[in-house]
Amino acid sequence: AIDEVAKFESVMETARKAIHDFINDEPNDLKIYEMEHPDVLLWAVWCIQQYAKMVSRDKCREKYGQLLEEIMEYLRRENHPNLFLHSNGLLYANGTEKAITWMNSTVNGHPVIPRTGYIVEINALWYNALCFVGELVGEAGNNNLAETLQTLAEQTGKSFIDTFLNEYGYLLDYVDGNMMDWSVRPNMIFTVAFDYSPLDARQKKGVLDVVTKELLTPKGLRSLSPKSGGYNPNYVGPQMQ
């Protein structure tokens, strides 16, 4: 709707300034809460991607093309305080000491679930962003950047499958070296939902089947499968429990 587009542009006008200043390490009175978290800039790209669907890719590129390029360059050059682009094309984030995703429950200042390393939804967002921005700049004739992003997307997509997809047909929640979290969690569903996914149709169906069977309830998705270790349907006692 027209009013939704206008509302988005109004909000993004504020966000754009805050993002620009964060990327360039400039002082800014416009603070976005938890801007430093690894997924915030990637969600900003996704939001602009939805805007492009509402208006047109040409208008989106005209209005936000420079911002998108700045974000991707910032991430590619590893200037983010807690996102590191590894040689396999995946983004690595450190979440051992501080909760860095939406699963941000803490006890005594430390995350209850220390999601760290290659985090599934962050790298799904990364792949989606590479493909979307790569296509967008290519349509504008910036072939060098388009080729760079598309080549990186191919590498990222292959590494994503090698790293996250397991023999049971679902995605690991996070991987840090030899530490692999096999918990069945809803974070993997983003890889099915995004416009650009490293998974093919068969792999998407496998993920969706697991999520549907183990996580879907009449109230929404569980944050953990009853079949996974650590699942507890009832919580009593102090915060630690």
Question: What residue ranges belong to the model's regions?
Answer:
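Alpha-helical scaffold segments in soluble metabolic enzymes
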Residues: 50, 70, 74, 125, ...
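Extended glycan-interaction surfaces of carbohydrate-active proteins
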Residues: 10-34, 77-118, 155-241
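Inter-helical turn/loop segments and adjacent helix faces that build the functional surface
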Residues: 51-63, 130-149, 202
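Aromatic-rich carbohydrate-recognition surfaces in CAZymes
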Residues: 1-94, 119-123, 127
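Hydrophobic core/packing positions within alpha-helical solenoid repeats
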Residues: 2, 48, 68, 130-133, ...
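A non-catalytic, amphipathic alpha-helix used as a structural packing/dimerization or gating element
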Residues: 70, 125-128, 148-155
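Alpha-helix C-terminal capping/termination sites
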Residues: 4-8, 54-57, 138-139, 184, ...
